[in-house]
Swiss-Prot record:
Superkingdom classification of source: Bacteria
Keywords assigned: DNA-directed RNA polymerase, Nucleotidyltransferase, Transcription, Transferase
Enzyme Commission designation: 2.7.7.6
Role, per record: DNA-dependent RNA polymerase catalyzes the transcription of DNA into RNA using the four ribonucleoside triphosphates as substrates.
Official protein name in the record: DNA-directed RNA polymerase subunit alpha
Disulphides: none
Alpha N-terminal domain (alpha-NTD): annotated segments: 1-231
Molecular function GO terms recorded: DNA binding; DNA-directed RNA polymerase activity; protein dimerization activity
Recorded family membership: Belongs to the RNA polymerase alpha chain family.
Free-text domain note: The N-terminal domain is essential for RNAP assembly and basal transcription, whereas the C-terminal domain is involved in interaction with transcriptional regulators and with upstream promoter elements.
Organism of origin: Cytophaga hutchinsonii (strain ATCC 33406 / DSM 1761 / CIP 103989 / NBRC 15051 / NCIMB 9469 / D465)
Catalysed reactions, as listed in the record: RNA(n) + a ribonucleoside 5'-triphosphate = RNA(n+1) + diphosphate
Assembly with partners or alone: Homodimer. The RNAP catalytic core consists of 2 alpha, 1 beta, 1 beta' and 1 omega subunit. When a sigma factor is associated with the core the holoenzyme is formed, which can initiate transcription.
């Protein structure tokens, strides 16, 4: 009995692309494969590509994030929020993970000023305001940069040995700002039930959308190769190995138990969730979008904010969190 062949695209069509935006088409695909491929690529693109981000800061005379700095209008918490948004592109092979920035006699500190103190990185959003400085004051700050994937909370960016005055911060490494996909019907000869997948990728400029798509596809290919006949093996699992604590399980459990009060939510979004008795990230992740739209004073702006939060944390709405035993201490 012969094996029926699948209808597959001969190539990927790049409709348009620049350093920040790419639009790609895959056609024709068998029915159902548009969503299957589109969703897999979207999740990998958002969570698994590498990038650079600030993971910690050190300011002379500052011991914690709730401090204020003489001659600087913003407090340290606001400065950290702004630094989390700075996007970097590595342009040199120099291994530089510390940047000391010194702002002297200028009214503001913008992201572009960081480039004056490093030759290893390009700042992709130079006009981003970090803080306002009294023109008669000086402002010095040491930035720690690291390479990583996805998102890491400040707790996981703490150095192995405690450093006096060092403040770890949340790091958003992913170079992908957004990914959208849609599936349309397409014709092959007389049949009109084949599918066309349209994939739209928005990056921060540190990676070209075409390279991002290739990188995500290669990650999937490497994982799927594990299921090929040549590499698939079955080994008996020892009882003691079954009792080994799963680090990923513990990480996810800790993340889901994070209090919403500890996250950088807007006042409106936080109050809407608080009124609905939603207190933790895990409780938020179990909700469906339709559930949230029923909340009092909850609108599209709050929904967009929470959708981005869920993406940044590599979660999804409608999650089944029962297996993480969040009710247990």
């Amino acid at each position: 009995m012969s094996i029926l062949s699948f209808q597959m695209p001969e190539k990927v069509v790049m409709e348009k692309a620049d350093d920040f935006h790419g639009l790609f088409e895959f056609k024709p695909l068998e029915k159902g494969y548009g969503v299957t491929i589109g969703n897999a690529l979207r999740r990998i693109l958002l969570s698994s590509l590498e990038g650079y981000a600030i993971t910690g800061i050190k300011v002379p005379g500052v011991l914690h994030e709730f401090s204020t700095i003489p001659g600087v209008r913003e407090d340290v918490t606001e400065i950290i929020l702004n630094l989390k948004q700075v996007r970097f592109k590595k342009i040199s092979d120099v291994n530089e993970n510390k940047i000391v920035v010194s702002i002297k006699k200028q009214a503001s500190f913008k992201a572009g000023d960081i480039a004056k103190f490093t030759s290893a990185y390009q700042i992709l959003n130079p006009e981003l305001l970090i803080c306002n400085v009294d023109s008669n004051s000086n402002f010095d700050i040491e930035l720690t940069l690291e390479k990583g994937r996805g998102y890491l909370p400040a707790e996981e960016n703490k150095p192995a040995e405690q450093i006096f005055g060092y403040i770890p911060i949340d790091a958003i490494f992913t170079p992908i700002k957004n990914v959208k996909y849609s599936v349309e019907n397409t014709r092959v000869e007389q049949r009109t039930d084949y599918e066309k997948l349209i994939l739209e990728i928005l990056t921060d400029g540190s990676i070209h959308p075409e390279d991002a798509l290739k990188g995500a596809a290669n990650i999937l290919i490497k994982h799927f190769m594990l299921f090929s006949d040549q590499t698939m093996t079955f080994e008996a699992v020892k009882a003691e190995e079954e009792e080994t604590v799963d680090e990923e399980f513990l990480h996810m459990r800790k993340l889901l138990k994070t209090s919403l009060a500890d996250l950088d939510l807007s006042v409106r979004a936080y109050n809407c969730l608080k009124a609905a008795d939603i207190k933790t990230l895990g409780e938020l992740a179990t909700l469906d979008i339709s559930d949230m739209m029923k909340f009092r004073n909850f609108g599209k702006k709050s929904l967009n904010e929470l959708e981005q939060l869920i993406i940044d944390k590599n979660l999804s709405f409608g999650m089944d969190t029962a297996k993480y035993k969040l009710d247990e201490d």
